[in-house]
Amino acid sequence: MRKAYLIAEVTVHDMEAYEHYRQQVVATLEAADARFLVRGGKRMQMEGADEAHHDNLRTVIVEFPSMEAALAWYESPAYITLIELRQSAADGRVFFVEGT
């Protein structure tokens, strides 16, 4: 079975609310047997359009056992309750990619 990866690129505009989201999301990921590969950290953009608000830009990569597990997590009642909190604290893109 191929692993799946959540990739999120978000610009945080409410750090307090985003930190509240970050603290709560961990338990939902642990329950889905997922793990963080990247959680923030230093970014070095090498190509493409320059992103505004570098200090508030976050990249997150999470590994899931499969695409099915990733989708089940995203649609789970535990995570659905956190989506609104994340969206109120940050704007960005969230997508899944299947690994090889």
What are these regions (language model features)?
Residues M1-T100:
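Conserved, structured core segments of small domains
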